Amino acid sequence: VVLFLASAPSYGATFEGKTITIVVGYKPGGGYDRYARLIAKYLPKYLPGNPGAVVQNMPGASSVIAANYLYSIAKPDGLTIGTFNNATVVAQLIKVEGVRFDLTKFAWLGSAASDAVILTVRSDLPYRTAEDLRKVKQFVIGTTGPGSSTHDFPALLEEFAGFDFKLVPGYSSSADVMLALERKEVDGRAGSYDSIKPFIDRGLVRPIIRNRTSAPGIEKLPVDENLATSAQGKLIMAVNAVPTQIYRPFVAPPATAKDALKMLRDAFAKALNDKDLLAEAEKGKMTIDYVSPEHALKIVAEVLGQPADVVQTLAKYIKFGD
């Protein structure tokens, strides 16, 4: 029996006259959106035919909606790529309702950056250490909802390290959380160090705690795992930190045409080494730390390879949604 497998349509060796769509799992203004727009500006330069590029924001369910779209609806013709919450791999691991993708089957371009996750407080508040914060009752933290680092990082600190937080979800982007903080609607926020650093530099917020991923300027902050009071808490925090090694993932749909995928991968790597992109990123205080598609898949496999008891425990504390 001879089987003929249908392949994705291919249009040859040029993107001339085409437009690349970059799907983003969050609304405009947040970190994922900023990286997508930076990539959209420089990626076409390294694709034959110099195509156009547009960003399509598709928020919802902490990026699960966008990931589902990229996996099963977007055409695998090389004209659609996307970026979504790095923690979607945890959503797949714990079998979150609504997940209809397999991250191992995406056509990976890689990641634009790794990043630390930090917890910060407003600088006008008197809290300067983790121990100061432990003494506060109902410290108010704005979040973009379960499944995001803005939510899960403080939620795990509350569960396993003795903090008393009042988490306020529902903000549609990290930029909206920061606006709430500036208006003093909330006392603090967590999330990507890269996204929060400009506000640290401005003196708006003060970093207090980080995850195991470090970066210049926050090396001496206490690590969440070291504040946990149980082995279970330390383990969950450790596993939850793994995806931050691919904090800004970029993928194409599964079965993307091989010739187009090779061009996209090459262009992605070259764009992230472009001197003008790097200068613009530095000006915008955005870290660029290219991760290859092969290494990104290794990180995904590491998370998805957790034993059943760890998965069961993670599922108790990590949720996804708005």
What are the functions of these language-model segments?
Residues 79-82, 118, 140, 187-188, ...:
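Short, Asp-centered acidic motifs that coordinate Mg2+ and/or phosphate
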Residues 114, 196-272, 320-322:
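C-terminal lobe and pocket-closing loops
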Residues 11-105, 146, 150, 159-190, ...:
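N-terminal (or domain-start) structured segment
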Residues 104-145, 161:
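A conserved helix-loop-strand patch within extracytoplasmic ligand-binding domains
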Residues 35, 129-132, 257-268, 277-281, ...:
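Short amphipathic alpha-helical coupling segments at ligand-binding clamshell hinges
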Residues 27-29, 86, 117, 122-127, ...:
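Short coil/turn segments
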Residues 89-97, 111-126, 155-160, 245-251:
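Periplasmic solute-binding protein
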Residues 1-6:
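Bacterial N-terminal signal peptides
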